[in-house]
Amino acid sequence: MKVINARNVNDALLLGLDLFQDPRNFREQESRNGTTYEALEPVTTVYNKPWERVMLVKLRDANPFFHFIEGLWMLAGRNDLKPLTYLLKSMEDFSDDGETLWGAYGYRWKSYFHKDQIKLVIEMLKANPDDRRCVLQMWDANKDLNRRGKDVPCNTTIYFKIRDKKLNMTVCNRSNDMLWGAYGANAVHMSMLQEYIASHLRVQIGTYRQVSDSFHVYHNELWERVKGLEIDPWTYSDIKNPYDLLEGTVYTNF
């Protein structure tokens, strides 16, 4: 198990790229979507400030507005495609019927299993802040296992617990594209979920851990663009901790 201990998603990106600089850490692996470089063992990313969720590395060229809207769409428990394709038409590529997303996380959080799992987690932790049974499920073995659709959930399970009056969250992921998934959409969506639940519990946001079983990057234009970034505290200090440069920004942690 490799552990990437990061301040935020920007920090994690540079540390993740550093992992793929050493050929002893990865192998070339074919996939249904093309050739990847895959870490030889699972990777856990630890975010110590998960609320610093916006990717500010210019070469990554992430769209924080779309990620934020998609995060709200998830918290609303929706699976309809139209609100997303209005902003990003290519989301249609992940739909089997052109109208919905099969693996929509928010829908699975709030409706798919015939219960609002988010509400239950909040109620459980309000009743017992020491509870260790707060498991939010996204993977349905009855329908997802051996399914050949376009959108099978990559994130499978989320665990919540309160320690030292902070809400910690661990997300388990079967397959994680480092650039588009782990340090793109996942860092935004899951930290928004953590913040939402913490706000209802009136506790601080703790650590967010993302456990990625298959941690990989695809051989594509984005990889070619960012792979040369290196961890250099003098050259890339403005990239590694960009939030230090946001003068006057105040974050209120409950």
Residue locations for each model-derived region?
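Terminal, non-catalytic protein-protein interaction segments that mediate quaternary/complex assembly
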Residues: 1-254
